Amino acid sequence: MTEKQLNDKILCKIKKGDTMQVVKNHNSEYPIGILWNMGNKYAREMMLKIAIMEDVLQVKILDLGKDYEQFVLDCYERDEEAYEGGYIYEKIKNMNTDNKRIVVFIFNVDNPTYQQAEDGKIQCIEARQVKQRIRKEYASKIDEYFFDNLIHISDNVEEAKRTLNTVNKYDKYTIGNYVRKGYKSILNESTKCQSKSYVSFLENLRGDKDERE
């Protein structure tokens, strides 16, 4: 079953019956998350909390340099809402600091549940819970916090696939890569940057400054 077929199947089940808002699907979901550079001081701490909530399978650090802005635009290319009113450009302006390092991670959700948003978008409930908890606990710690400039997590299979393709396009910027023992790499695997633990290379981000350019 393709990603689109899976999402269509979920959507049909959600729409069946006026009271049915949530559906279980017994396949696994592999949401892709991004910890934006604004939160690097807390990246290690946030990843450890995420690992308590869900099984983290892979963690990468990308140092995007001059291609940082284009990476953000590519991530939200299919998100019309992000472009309305110039929101995406305000987001980039807020996040465009002298530090261009981001953390990309993948985790596993077994037996995920889904809901349909008001705009019709299918959302993995467990993935959204991770995102909402991190925002709730860390938004107040970020100087000049601007909504969504801390963490991004894919909401469904199709969005995860698009994010995966985007991240893999920028694989040359990888400076750290961890794959959980016993699992195959989902993101492109950069063996030259391989690490047995993501805790150590995330620790190195704590000193990152976030002065706006």
Task: Please report, for each region that a protein language model flagged, where it lies by residue.
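Non-catalytic terminal and connector segments of soluble metabolic enzymes
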Residues: 2-205
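Catalytic metal-binding acidic patch
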Residues: 209-213
